[in-house]
Amino acid sequence: MGMITNDWLDAISGEFKKPYYRELYQFVREEYARTTVYPPADDIFNAFHFTPLSKVKVLLLGQDPYHNVNQAHGLSFSVLPEQREIPPSLQNIYKELHDDLGCYIPNNGYLKKWADQGVLLLNTVLTVRRSEEHTF
């Protein structure tokens, strides 16, 4: 699993030393070893990698990662560029942005540009088993 290396580390590093975190880390490692889990392990903390704490302007909180191939990559509501279908939850966000603010609706669901602009795209759960919603 990719480690956090920016200013988020100072803010949350104390959690990494606590017993619950060590147990959780071990559990997640075992899940990755025995089954398919999304996002890929190196992408789990992408929300923190792409949006440093000092750059956060707004939080867009999702529930859990998408659970199918070529979707989850560590940013809530975002899918990888090769995924041509925009998930319904993101379609709803795009529709609201268009209806309320007149924003352009992109033809893809890759939101890294939002993250780079200070939108923290974080799920309340960072990993999910393939094809199973709400698994852990």
Q: Where are the regions a protein language model picked out?
A:
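A polyanion-binding, active-site-adjacent surface
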Residues: 2, 14-136
